[in-house]
Amino acid sequence: MKFTLSWLKDHLDTDASVDEIAEALTDLGLEVEEIVNPADRLAGFTLGHVKHAEKHPDADKLRVCTVETDEGDLQIICGAPNAREGITVVVCKPGMYIPGLDITISVGKIRGVESFGMMASERELELSDEHDGIIELPSGEVGDRFVDWLAENDPSKVDPMIEIAITPNRPDALGVAGIARDLAARGLGTLKVRDYTPVPGDFESPIKVSIDEDTLDGAPHFTGRLIRGVKNGPSPQWLQDQLKAIGLRPISALVDITNYMTFDHNRPLHVFDADKVQGNLRVHRAKGGEKLVALDEKEYSLQPGMMVISDDKGPESIAGIMGGEETGCTEETVNVFLESAFWDHVQIALTGRALKINSDARYRFERGVDPEYTREGLEHATQMILDICGGEASNVVEAGKAPNHARAYKLDAARVQSLVGMEIPESEQRQTLTRLGFRLDGEMAHVPSWRPDIMGEADLVEEVARIASLTKLQGIPLPRTTAGIPKPVMTPTQRRQSMARRTCAALGYNECVSYTFIDQASAALFGGGDAATMLENPISSEMSHMRPDLLPGLLQAAARNQARGYADLALFEVGPVFHDGEPGDQQTQITGLLVGRSGPKDVHGASRPVDLFDAKADAEAVLAAIGAPAKVQILRGGDAWWHPGRHGKICLGPKKVLGVFGELHPRVLQALDIKGPAMAFTIWSDQVPMPRKSGATRSALELRDLQAVERDFAFVVNADIEALTLVNAAAGADKALIEDVRVFDEFIGGSVGEGKKSLAITVRLQPSDATLKEKDIEAVSTKIVEKVMKATGGVLRG
């Protein structure tokens, strides 16, 4: 929406500057996108007086002028036919930028004679398209600023243009009057209310109007009148200047008046050449297939149900969007029929979209115009036509009636504080709404017809707060029920996820955020892809199922990176996975993926391919960071997408699985186009028990002053016996005394025998109340041997 400062002042009595108005508009929600101030580009130009002018010695059409300026006399070569002695001109001195030519003037020689500047035409200063000669001013002193002369003698030439962005909920701001109303409510001036004086008719209109019954829902109200004896010449200069300033080309008085009403009061109108209309006008729905050449000289084929205005010949206008060329006005037009109607915004939008027509009328009708201004807008436009074009008006013809959108909501002054947090006195709230056009009746606020966005009490609060300025909103801490240390902002689960992200990043991983939707084939590779997780209305076939695991998204990201030459990758993601369609079947995963080598090439040693122990170490680091117990077990038996024999489950006890680490199955990597082996870890953070709540104080560190004792044992067991089985058996011999059990050696072959292996462990004994004696150590050692032999079937190696 564009308008000029002078246009705004037609509706607002204000002394505010352009900057103050722009700041207020943005604060009111009408964001200023651009300000074009002609005074800025004209600030350096000054007035000069041509003291002498003579023919150029080497060019018939050039004159050598001596121009008096504020910096002394300058010799300027000029080719304008009106360059002569005694005139006041606009001087462009060397070093100045000429906007119309897009050059910076400099001292130069023209046909051997030096020129120290130029005298400007209106086109060269972007004041108009006039370039038949240089600017001649009837007044002004040498050295005066040209912009000051324009401000006093021709202010339209330096009228600032403001462009604002209009949100869909504010159609009232598509008229300058609506913008002025907001500024007046803010306190930047006083709104000038235009008097509504109906224009009396001098005769009955020969053209009548009717609306078909099935069209009343889309065209509830139509008004019009015939004006005869008009003269459709150029519009007045003030009207042309205002339209030019906002980028519209003046066409004729009648067209310019309708354009003016569109931007001035958000009231689109249409003017028919009454002598070209045959019979009466009828508003109805198209049957389909009708043709109409519109004012843009394009032919449109109407679809069934579109609203049109027809005479006895056929369609003459696409209702609310664009008129027809056949009944359009020309310079020869003498009698016109002026239309002002209200159209349903949804049907206008559908028709405009189907026909691919973008017009100012469509833009406004599909957002909503004031239904109660239909008749009043007709009267205002009629008066403008009579004032500018002459003629006499008929009585108004009318079909239908304005739809009743009246509504009222209770104004609760306390809700401004509860909803927005601003303390605004009730008297100020009522004054604000009154200035915005609301009618107050006790506690009820009646919404003005031009505000379709006000649909409840909360909207009243928003209007009050908007006019008061949300920039004045002060931060107020939320009340606390208990004093002391502030409660944490994040929940324990959120803190755990945040810590997991920080830890993975510290380990050198890059975070990925992938879609929770994946294709069925990828989901099936990881135990999903069934009907329970299938979307009813997927975005695409590649997003048909909820993901059962984070690994598909990470592997797809890795494949895309490998395709672009990035072979060494460390990626992680924290997010939800879905095993069924019910809310309880959602879990949170922490997953990391390693592909390629452990690091870049280095002169101090070759990098190595990543292996499962890298994934194991990273998984243990993440578990430790999120508070998992230190004593966990590594067991076999992962899912089918893990490489058999090259992965392990991290368990808390024999059944509670906290995570998995290892190498991914080659079949999965091939299906997802991953080159080379890939290591990964997956942690189910929901399975990691939350740490117990601790009190305000911590117990003192307990340091035992008794000497610990370590004993080594070697056992010969079957080759398929896991080391963990042996460790758990040894640790269970005396849980109070045995502090730690570690495997330190494995031997296969030789004297051990076929199908056997030797596992050596170190057992650390830590007494708590007395130093261990030899008999105590021997007793524990005997229990350890018995426990291990019973659990593994092995023997103590001699």
Please provide the spans of the model-predicted regions.
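A carboxyl-terminal module marker
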Residues: K2, E20, R435-G437, D585, ...
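Glycine/proline-enriched, intrinsically flexible loops and inter-domain linkers
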Residues: L5, E23, L28, R63, ...
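Beta-rich nucleic-acid/ligand-interaction surfaces
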Residues: A39-A43, P198-P200, M261, T482-I485, ...
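Conserved mixed alpha/beta core segments that line enzyme active sites in large multi-domain catalysts
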Residues: L47-I77, D241, T258-E326
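Mobile "lid/hinge" segments at catalytic clefts and subdomain interfaces of large enzymes
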Residues: R111-E124, E130-E136, G143, S156, ...
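Terminal amphipathic helices with adjacent charged low-complexity linkers/tails
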Residues: L183, G187-E213, C389-V416, E423, ...
